Every structure is written in C-alpha cells, then in structure tokens.
Amino acid sequence: MNQSAEAPSSENVATRQIRIFDTTLRDGEQSPGASMNLAEKLEVASALVDLGVDIIEAGFPIASPGDFESVRQIATTIRGATICGLARCAEKDIDRAWEALKTAPQARIHVFLATSAIHREFKLRMTPDEIVERAVAGVRRAASHCDDVEFSPEDACRTEHDFLCRVVEAAIDAGATTINVPDTVGYTTPGEIYDRFKMLRDRVPNMDKAVLSTHCHDDLGMAVANSLAAVDAGAGQIECTINGIGERAGNAALEELVMAMKTRQDFYHCQTNINSKRLVPVSRLVSKTTGINVQRNKAIVGRNAFAHESGIHQDGMLKERTTYEIMSPEEVGFTKTDLVLGKHSGRAALADRAKQLGMTLTGEQLQEVFEAFKELADKKKEIYDGDIVALVQQKISETVAPEWTLVDYEVTSGKNQTPNVRVTLRRDEQDITEQVAQGDGPIDAAFWAVEKITGIQVVCKDFRVRSATLGRDAIGEVNLEVEHEGKTYRGTGVSTDSVESTILAMLNAINRIVAGIASDPGELPQP
C-alpha cells in the first residue's frame, strides 16, 4: 500500500477513470427512517444523473411491490446512467429484477451470495461447492437477460482467500463483468483490504475480464479509508451513498471519496465523472428527502466544513486562503455570498438564485415558491440561501395536491396558563373548519387541533426542528415522522414561527396519508 508521507510524483503516471456506483436508493434507504416514496426516488435519481454518477442502484425489486415499481419507473424515465437492480442468486429474484429493469437503455443486474465461513455455516447452511454452484447459476441467469452483470460475494472481507478466489473466478467465467468485494459488516482495515484486492488481481487468472469494485460499511469508521485503499490496489468502481447513509453506521460517503481523489489526484492518480459543484445541493436534497440531517462537522458538505473560528486560522485565511483550505467551498457547491434577496426581488432573481443553488423549478413550482418567498420577505428583512433552499424543498416535497391547507392559526399561552391553539383549515379549497385544542405546549396543542379537524389520528415517532439560517428571525424547519394504521409517513414544514412550521409539517404528513403515500421500504437484504 502506498503509505509514503510525501505525495508520489505524478510524472509518467496514467490517470485512471473510477466508476461511481451510487446505492443511496437501495442501501442508503435501509438506514432507519430513510425510506422514500416513488416521487422522491425519481427526484433523487434525476439529481444523481446531474451529479454525474455512472451507475444508480435503484432498489431490490423482489423486496416489495413498491420497490419493484420504483425500479421500473426509474428504469423507464431516467437517462444518462446505468440503472441497476439487486437480486439474490435465485431465479425468481433475478427474473423479477430484469422485469423491472428491461426498459432501461443501460441496465445492470447485481446478484449476491454470502461466501464467508460464518455465513455458509449459520445462515445458508451450504457447503463451499454448493455456494460456487449457486453463484454460477445466478450469474448465468442474470447474463441471459443482459450483458452487464455484477456479482457480490457477501461478507467477502471475512471470506478465506482461497475460496474467495475460487468463487470470483467461477463468477467471471459464468459472465460477471463486475466483481464487487463488500466489507459487509465494516470489519476490515485499509491495509487488509489493500492486500485482499491485490491478492485477487494477482491470483484470479481471469480477473482482467471484470472490473473490481469496493463496497464498504462504516461500522468502525473506516468506510472511506477502506474504499480509497481498494482503489489504490486497483479497484475500478466504488459503491457509496450520498452523505454516507446506509445500514447500521452507514456506507462510504460519495462526497468524501470524490473530493479525496480530486484533491489528492497527485496521490491516487484517479478521476471520476462527478460534477463536484453539485455535491452540496444533492446532499441537501437527500437530507431533506430522507429526514436525516447532515452533522455540522461532516466533511465536504457539513455546515462547518469551511468555517474558521480560530483567530490564527482566520488571520491565515485573510492573508492566503490556501493556508487553511485544501479546497474551495465553491468547488463542492457552497456559494460565496449567503445574503441574496429581499422583499423587492422578482421571480427572475429568485429563479436564478435557485438555479445557482442547484435547484431547477418548473413554472408552477416557481410561482408557488415565489408566493411563499414574498410572504417570508414580509416577515424577514434579509433572505438567505438557506431560506431559499428550505422554501424550494418544502414545495418540492409536496408530491400530491394537498387536500388540507392552513388558513389561519392563533396561539394563547403563558407561564400560568394552559396553552391553547386555534387552527383553521380548508379542505379541497372549499370547506373551512376551525378547532381549538389544549396541550402540554403550543406544539402539542397544534397537533391535537389538526387531528380534531381532519379526523386522522397519528402517533408521532420523530420530531425535529432546525434553523435553516442564522439570526433571531431565522426560518425554522420541522421534520416529523408519524405512524397511522401501521404505516409511516413523513412531513416537512417551514416558517419563521415554530408552531406554524409544525402545523404545516403535520398537514404535509396527513395529505400523504390521504393520498396513500407511505414511507415503507419493506424487507431489504444487503450485500
């Protein structure tokens, strides 16, 4: 492994192209609470194409009817990337995956089968010979449908070297064009994975007929480091997710991998097709869609990633930016100027700013966002980028025509007074209903009032409030998860008033209940 303290010379070293395989819609969605509905998956898939990913793993078609339909719709409508579906090494899985993928101009079937001794003995109860036989049959079945077949020996990083080489060689002979080596439980280390990839390249005689891929989990916090070590050892594809979301502790973060290879091209001698200026907008979209906030100190896309508080650092930055910044905020999609618009700004200025922030609006969306923007401008002197992002994503998240809309609300509360909230709602642009409710606080009272009007009872499973911008007049964004009749629904609301944000988020979730748009990923196995 190249562990030199000094960067190696880039002279006479060819730059390799690394494929980016994004599994946000499959492995990322397995992160607890991160499930997405069809419209949200299509929006994320479109954003991934704009970002420049090479392969989009759209889902696991046999897992549920909803997952099948998501993969089918993405395969039918999304262009500009290979669309991939996951399948176990079983005919029914593989045929179901192909049924969902067959309309895609570029389709890939990704089959997997566990190979480690612990999985063979306790999960599959199969002998090594039976594993090889099933792997070969699965790859052949997939290859009968399409030319692009990926095989993953699940838990490869805990599989004996000799047996791993045997399975990989057999899979390539059967038609696998990509061999993915998963660190399924996030157990390996950079040195170990480097040696494993080098071993496969040296010992598997037909390895040159397939692309080696890495898929690392972050249980020990080494997913990105392990993925980069695999690239250093010859991997030509990295499997990753936006913001590193995924099963348990998550997956390797796409944004960190891409910027590590870009910033240290002198070391890795690799490049990708990723447009790095789209990283922050796509990160925000996935965060908004899944309801999983990005931690402030997250590398590359966190709010503090380019913040400098130390006086020594600030002094150095003023004298020469590169003293404390190894890449520029603009390079990953942050904007130089945060303060942008005011109450006298027009539609064109709003549309232009939204585009600069990575969000293209349709005419109808622009009109809705502009109306919300003007309302906000009457409440706030200065409109920040974060305000615009919150407004746009709020409107985009409204994937169905709302049955219930907010007309008015009024809060009465005090130190020695039980909070009362009066809420007035309109249904289908016609009937107006008003209710007053009490609660442990204004937000609890607002929940009760909305439930009384709509007649829909829910259990709040998660409730989060965050400030979209700085200042005492900042927009508050509420993201909540509610349960109704055994299904989970998400809602989002933004306003300068936390009670109004809560009511809007509640209505967003209730309108999804009425429309039957649940957030339910089903059972999703993983490689």
Curated annotation (Swiss-Prot):
GO terms for cellular component: cytoplasm. It is an enzyme of class 2 (transferase). Keywords: Amino-acid biosynthesis, Branched-chain amino acid biosynthesis, Cytoplasm, Leucine biosynthesis, Manganese, Metal-binding, Transferase. Its EC number is 2.3.3.13. The keyword Metal-binding applies. Its cofactor is Mn(2+). InterPro entries: 2-IPM_HCS-like, 2-isopropylmalate_synth_dimer, AIPM/Hcit_synth_CS, Aldolase_TIM, LeuA/HCS_post-cat, LeuA_allosteric_dom_sf, LeuA_bact_synth, PYR_CT. Residues 405-527 are annotated as: Regulatory domain. The keyword Metal-binding applies. Mn(2+) binds at D27, H215, H217, N251. It holds the Pfam family HMGL-like. Signal peptide: none annotated. It is found in: Cytoplasm. Pathway: Amino-acid biosynthesis; L-leucine biosynthesis; L-leucine from 3-methyl-2-oxobutanoate: step 1/4. GO terms for biological process: L-leucine biosynthetic process. PROSITE patterns: AIPM_HOMOCIT_SYNTH_1, AIPM_HOMOCIT_SYNTH_2, PYR_CT. It comes from the Bacteria. Residues 18-280 form the Pyruvate carboxyltransferase domain. Catalyzes the condensation of the acetyl group of acetyl-CoA with 3-methyl-2-oxobutanoate (2-ketoisovalerate) to form 3-carboxy-3-hydroxy-4-methylpentanoate (2-isopropylmalate). Belongs to the alpha-IPM synthase/homocitrate synthase family. LeuA type 1 subfamily. Homodimer. This is 2-isopropylmalate synthase. The lineage of its organism: Bacteria, Pseudomonadati, Planctomycetota, Planctomycetia, Pirellulales. The gene is leuA.
